[in-house]
From Swiss-Prot:
Tissue: Ubiquitously expressed.
Pathway linked to the protein: Protein modification; protein ubiquitination
Bias-annotated ranges (Basic and acidic residues): 131-145
Residue ranges annotated for the UBC core domain, each copy included: 4-150
Originating gene: UBC1
Name used for this protein in its record: Ubiquitin-conjugating enzyme E2 1
Active-site feature positions: C88 (glycyl thioester intermediate)
Taxonomic superkingdom: Eukaryota
Lineage: Eukaryota, Viridiplantae, Streptophyta, Embryophyta, Tracheophyta
GO CC field: cytosol
Length: 152
């Protein structure tokens, strides 16, 4: 069944295949265009460098008028990522706009990795460490990066 949301997701997927932004990839699951798996690679020259972080994106029939539910499947240590993997990012909540596509969502999340907002913490320990002890924070991030290599 073709709906506006499904047509838009097909367009997003096509664009992602034809012009993939650096360091991200994503695709719908084989039998469900409304559920995507994605990977964000840790940006070079950052504590996240070398990491491979898996996410899931769940779209509703209201897409693109409503944002998807996005979660990290990989374990993360970041001021704006909750323990369950959900992400505190303005464009996924109150700043959502239908102009955002899957590539824009994933690129924004990749940027958030390196540029957290400690004023809106989802993980208070990570936010405190990021603000008070950058060295210790970076060490914890490196641990998460190393775990990303062996996690399923």
């Amino acid at each position: 069944m073709s709906t506006p949301a499904r047509k838009r997701l097909m367009r997003d997927f096509k664009r992602l295949q034809q012009d993939p932004p650096a360091g991200i990839s994503g695709a719908p699951q084989d039998n469900n265009i409304m559920l995507w798996n994605a990977v964000i690679f840790g940006p070079d020259d950052t504590p996240w460098d070398g990491g491979t972080f898996k996410l899931s994106l769940q779209f509703s029939e209201d897409y693109p008028n409503k944002p998807p539910t996005v979660r990290f499947v990989s374990r993360m240590f970041h001021p704006n990522i909750y323990a369950d993997g959900s992400i505190c990012l303005d464009i996924l909540q109150n700043q959502w706009s239908p102009i955002y596509d899957v590539a824009a969502i994933l690129t924004s999340i990749q940027s958030l990795l390196c540029d957290p907002n400690p004023n809106s913490p989802a993980n208070s320990e990570a936010a405190r460490m990021y603000s008070e002890s950058k060295r210790e924070y970076n060490r914890r991030v490196r641990d998460v990066v190393e775990q990303s290599w062996t996690a399923d």
